[in-house]
Amino acid sequence: AGTNCYYLTFKSQEAVDNVFKDAEAMGLKVIRVWGNLDVGVKTGTTDSEGKPVFTNNNDGSGEKDGVYFQYFDKDLGKPVTNFGEDGIKKLDYALYQAEKHGMKLLITFTNYWDAFGGMGQYVKWAEELGITGLKKDDFYTNETLKGWYKDYINGLLNHTNPYTNRKLKDEPSVFAW
């Protein structure tokens, strides 16, 4: 049996630990989590809580609890992955806990809905380069959007989890993506 826990990759370690304890007590074996939390353009400013501020977000303020996985870097002209404490390291910790509790994660790397950025955020990133008129469905056919997505996946799969010292592509706690 399994469940969906979209917030597992942006909450505190204590919250993640509690989710896994509860899931283990219920006999769950698979948890679907979001491996995407895409935001717009980093402004270089912070809010009153010290979190970075982003513009051109597909989903409200973009970040969730100060966590974001990708943002658009105007200087580079492409999305950049955040592997830090307020980024992919949250997914790393969830994978570590999944293995510790004998579970596996089904990781989504993007979504069609606007929540967490998704395909719509890729369209907004393209607008930053002057590529206009795209819709979410163009994610499947536009070479720029597809290239960015492939770069994201390649970076994730070859990223070494600091908790397990394994690349994501070698993590035994991954059920699927």
Residue ranges and their predicted role:
Residues 2-177:
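Active-site mouth of glycoside hydrolases
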